[in-house]
Amino acid sequence: MPRSSPSVLVVGGGAASVFVTVALRERAAALGLPAPEVTVVARDIPVGLGLAYGRAEAHHRLNSPASAMSLSSAEQGGFLAHLDEMGWRDVDGSEASAGSFIPRQVYGGYVAGAFQALLDDPASGVTAVQGEAVSVVDVGGRSAVTLADATELQADVVVLALGNPPPGRVRVPTAGVGRTVDDPWARGALDGIRATDRVLLIGTGLTTIDIATSLARRHPGVVMTATSRHLLLPAVHLVAPVPAWPGFVSSGEAPRLPGLLREFGRQLRTASAAGEPWQPVLDGVRPQIHALWQALDAADRKRFVAHVARRWDVHRHRMAQSVWAELSALIDSGTLTLSADVSGEEFDVAVNCTGPNSVAAPGWSPLVDGLLSAGAVVPDPAGLGFDADASGALVGAAGGVSTRLFAIGAALKGALWETVAVPEVRLVATRIAERVLPA
């Protein structure tokens, strides 16, 4: 009797759900199995956009080059081929290259279009259901997912592709501010900001850059101040790609954070002494991050989050040269000022640009609240997301690793650290497919 494939239900309508769908189909094809039935439950249609691409404005760029953005792990040039097929040209008329940083709206169209093609193929086994999942429970060896309208769907495996929660509330330094925007990615969040408003942007990361450039384009002459404790802006990608360094050489012993930091510092000094840029050193470590992070004990992970994470993030998650050119022009013109010492009374509106809260935080999702309450999932030791193994299989309160409940994306930040950029999302999607469809 031919082997069948399990049914899979993916909760979430962003790009990660499409990566999981594609990975499952590729895995089944590689094993000579029938394509699994995949159902994606999404609050917003079309599937594939999510907040990252569905709320992006036309000038918002990807933070990774086009060569890294393919949906398929087997066809790394897929996104570039798509751009060539559609005849895409940048604002300066140039064609896309491997090192191009493409607008996020364009990438969202690529992802959503790929999923729509699967929906349009009656033989694909892929379906989409619009709605909000509010609970996942075990029912007779399967998983039952209940939607807000009381619809119940069942599958053998559930993958949580929940995306990013809204930012946590920020009270300081907003005391005295006329009004606040708690979530800049909520629909219409920036519409109430006027050209004459004195705007405080809380945070100096990638979200701040998106919001600052958006407000400056909407309201030429607007005056903005960005604030954070250390005023660290994201670093900038090199003009041309440089091959990555080899990363860390294993000593055969369990890594500890002090030793890893010493070795990383040594490599940076070596690069500097040779007149080479630092970016390839960090890029060489990137493929090793999941294994290194999982090998660290809870104490070292917490130390990293407390003392290293912010500087790691601004160097790891870099902006394109064109984005830096626009941002630096705002700073040079006085449109945007950076200040660590601000008073709320000086501003008409404050925008929370601190980034998403933890997926494991209570109150933002009835689905997450229910899973935590039932012990089906637990927060990771650092409180950044859910505890899980390298394949995204979630750990329950009893300590066991689930064979039916997985996660991908921001939910795995505390388990794997680097989880939200496309290369890591694609990698975890492949691992999930390998677990769901073993050889």
Task: Describe each model-derived feature in a short phrase.
Residues 1-45, 51-54, 93-258, 262-439:
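Flavin (primarily FAD) cofactor-binding/catalytic cores of flavoenzymes
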Residues 43-90:
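Redox-cofactor-proximal catalytic regions of oxidoreductases
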